[in-house]
């Protein structure tokens, strides 16, 4: 009976977590614009690097998503990277980090 019960409980997956951190369509567009314009002002409008490092999926491939999320929210002391916690929720930061690692979408 325990085996049957265990099978009936859905497994937690990365897809379920990603879906939970997906913003509403209107908010998603706001976040895309924020990253392209505000982050792009230092990291380059195409996020290929500028005053700040590149934010391409290749450049971020070895960084854990949780690290990127924390940098977005809290900044990097001693650098020009500011904290965005006052404007972004943890869910927003998780979505941005995930999308940066996938190859950030263009604004529609």
Language-model-detected regions and their locations in the chain:
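Alpha-helix initiation/capping motif
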Residues: 20, 24, 28, 44, ...
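Short cysteine/histidine-rich zinc-coordinating motifs and their immediately flanking basic loops
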Residues: 51-56
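Extracytoplasmic electron-transfer domains, predominantly the class I c-type cytochrome c fold
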Residues: 57-106
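Sequence/structural segment immediately N-terminal to covalent heme-attachment motifs in c-type
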Residues: 24-48, 67-74
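Sec-dependent N-terminal signal peptides
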Residues: 1-3
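Electrostatic cytochrome c docking/interface patches
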Residues: 7-34, 104-108
């Amino acid at each position: 009976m325990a085996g049957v019960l265990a099978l009936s409980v859905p497994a937690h997956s990365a897809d379920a977590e990603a879906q939970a951190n997906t913003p509403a369509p209107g908010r998603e567009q706001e976040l895309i614009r924020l990253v392209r314009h505000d982050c792009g002002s230092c990291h380059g409008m195409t996020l290929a690097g500028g005053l700040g490092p590149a934010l391409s999926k290749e450049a971020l491939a070895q960084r854990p998503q949780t690290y990127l999320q924390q940098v977005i929210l809290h900044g990097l002391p001693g650098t020009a990277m500011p904290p965005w916690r006052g404007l972004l929720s943890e869910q927003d930061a998780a979505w941005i980090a995930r999308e940066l690692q996938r190859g950030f979408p263009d604004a529609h």
